[in-house]
Structure formats: C-alpha cells, structure tokens
Amino acid sequence: MESIELKVRPGAEPAGAVDELSGRVPELKAQWAALLEQAAAERSELLELPPYELSAKPSKNFQVIGMLFKTIQAHQRQNEYPKSVALCCLTEDDATMYRQVYNFYIPNTKAERMNSGLWD
C-alpha cells in the first residue's frame, strides 16, 4: 500500500526555499527520483524528506510541491518500496498547503483526498 504522510517538525532544517527552487523543478524531480530509487534499492519502509520553506505565492508552492507529490506517486505505482514517504513541514499552515496541493493534483475521488479532519 502506497502512503504519503505529513509530519510537522518546527525545528527541522529546510532543504531550501520554494521561491528559489521554483526555477529548478526538473533538477529537483531528478533528486527526488534518486532518493526514492535509493530507498527502493535498500527496501526502506519509510523515506522521510526534509521540509521546504514555502512561498507567499501559492502558485510557486503548487509548482514545486505538486511535482514532489507527482514524483512520489509515480514511483509508488511502480515500486514496492519505500512503503511510506513522510514529508516534513515546518508549521501546521505549511502542512495545510501541502494537503491543498496534494488534493488538487493527486486524488481521483473525495475518499482519496488527504484530510486533516478540518474539511468536509
């Protein structure tokens, strides 16, 4: 079973700022794919990815985080490992943005949405 989860870690070191990374999405996609492939080769149950400092511009967050979700989902469809990918977020508001991006791009049905219990 494929799984993507969010973990709020306020003290975690960001892997970068979305404002600076939005112009490097193909490079980021390759880096994420390499991390997923390494986790698959090691048969890791869990791959935990560091947080990103989100942008004040939602469009940039959708561009970067959307590609992150798409990359993870494509890998999980083709590979058994990692069984779960945990995306760290710096704040609850960041986790909400991640959920919004996920729900925009990934689920085909309402039941597949990532929900914190705050929405319908």
Regions found by a protein language model. Name each.
Residues M1-D120:
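Macrodomain-like recognition of ADP-ribose-binding/processing modules
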